[in-house]
């Protein structure tokens, strides 16, 4: 069956985006014959710029950060935090980062092999630690007073070298050398759960997690240390030291599957995301940008300001 043609473009991405080969392009290509053009019928944009305001077509806001859409500028949105708007779809950061299948424990999962590895106590890997991430800073010092926590990032580095970046293979290689990993989100926002949490599971270490408790909908609470379930950081650190000094208790937690029921939850579903995008793209309506009476003046000001010739 011939696919419908979709004239598409992207704007305001961070860095150089491969418009013909990225997550959303490839997802939409399952349903459409996607053609990247300068005058699209649909524009997908992020929060990193304002060029999207030059377009009067249907616009979809997409972000993997804690930003909410400006409904004066877009017709639909895919966000990593919860919003009660009917035309916004919640697709968490951790789902966009890796496949849920990576967290399913196989029937022959060998927990003992991991326990036999010569691992250190706990890892910490962050670029910065200041007043904006005070809980993370305070927790590091609270646990580090009890037993040395190895920090491989710029913040509180005490291992003699810096792990290149805080994501990717280097990160996984570093945190897989430890029994615990401090996985604190930068902020508490409804729905905001990132790869900081799930990367620890993939490294077969126990996450010490501080973040939005909506994560408990999908993740097994017996498989990690939920910092927010304790009265204070001191009480949580006491429990971590109990696990550290009780091999059987630690082994029990490590053996637990990260996902509830050891099954991939629907929140990971790319099919559901595609259904939402197709529904919004095919919706017949006047785009939000054209519903503003001052649209021509706004476009002219932006062209002058950004010196975008030929627009």
Language model feature labels by segment:
Residues 2-62, 67-150, 155-183, 190-311:
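Pol beta-like nucleotidyltransferase catalytic core
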């Amino acid at each position: 069956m011939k696919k419908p043609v979709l004239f598409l473009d992207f704007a305001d991405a961070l860095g150089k985006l491969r418009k013909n080969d990225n997550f959303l392009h490839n997802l939409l290509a399952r349903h459409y014959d996607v053609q990247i053009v300068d005058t699209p019928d649909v524009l997908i944009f992020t929060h990193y710029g304002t060029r999207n305001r030059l377009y009067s077509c249907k616009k979809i806001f997409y972000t993997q950060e804690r930003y909410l859409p400006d409904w004066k500028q877009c017709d639909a949105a895919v966000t990593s935090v919860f919003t009660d708007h009917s035309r916004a779809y919640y697709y968490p950061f951790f789902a966009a980062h890796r496949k849920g299948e990576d967290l399913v424990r196989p029937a022959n999962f060998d927990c003992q092999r991991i326990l036999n590895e010569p691992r250190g106590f706990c890892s910490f890997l962050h670029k910065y630690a200041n007043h904006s991430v005070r809980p993370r800073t305070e927790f590091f010092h609270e646990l580090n007073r009890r037993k040395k926590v190895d920090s491989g990032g710029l913040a509180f580095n005490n291992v003699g070298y810096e792990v290149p970046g805080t994501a990717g293979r280097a990160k996984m290689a570093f945190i897989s050398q430890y029994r615990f990993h401090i996985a604190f989100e930068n902020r508490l926002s409804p729905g905001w759960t990132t790869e900081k949490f799930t990367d620890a599971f993939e490294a077969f270490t126990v996450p010490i997690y501080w973040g939005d408790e909506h994560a408990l909908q999908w993740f097994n609470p017996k498989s990690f240390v939920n910092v927010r379930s304790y009265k204070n950081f001191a009480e949580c650190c006491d429990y971590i030291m109990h696990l550290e000094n009780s091999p059987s208790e630690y082994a029990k937690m490590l053996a637990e599957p990260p996902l509830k029921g050891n099954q991939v939850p629907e929140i990971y579903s790319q099919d559901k995301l595609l259904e939402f995008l197709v529904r919004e793209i095919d919706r017949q309506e006047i785009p939000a940008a054209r519903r503003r009476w001052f649209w021509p003046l706004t476009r002219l000001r932006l062209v002058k300001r950004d010196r975008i010739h030929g627009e």
